Amino acid sequence: SCVSLFQQRYSRTSIRINRAVPHFLFVIMPSRGWVAQTLTVMEEITAYSILKELGNDALYKYIYENIAELTFDSHRITNYFPQDFQDCYERMLIAHADEGDIRNRNAIIANRIGIYLGHNSRALQIEKIGEVTSINMNGEETPTSLWRKY
């Protein structure tokens, strides 16, 4: 890890980790006093982190402007995501490049979108009302969440 590599190089190192903020504070004791250095740790890029970057406002707008029905399933979003959010989708494919073929990566991306909808349902003004079976982005019939707009 980054911390252990740093400790190997600087044996007199005090490391404090603040889990609420994504950085480490390294305090090094060289021969002439203490030096503090902050190292920012980037969040791992995943489909979920890309959705967080896209933001609730964009997804809320998408749901309310592109889905006419009061109820919809997650596949209604995931199946059109590659076309409607092409840049995000391509970044997601790259982020999960080592996780199998395109069908597997599509399943991972769709799963992360579903998780994101669940975690952010209040901000997106939707509520999960059950499960249904429908056609996914790989053309397979699979279970998915059913949502209702507020």
What do these predicted ranges mean?
Residues 78:
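The alpha-helix within a helix-turn-helix
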Residues 8-9:
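Cationic, low-complexity basic patches in intrinsically disordered or flexible, solvent-exposed regions
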Residues 23, 30-37:
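Long, compositionally biased intrinsically disordered regions
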Residues 38-65, 75, 83, 87, ...:
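Phospho-regulated, low-complexity intrinsically disordered regions of nuclear gene-regulatory
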Residues 70:
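Flexible coil/turn residues that form the inter-helical turn or adjacent wing/linker of helix-turn-helix
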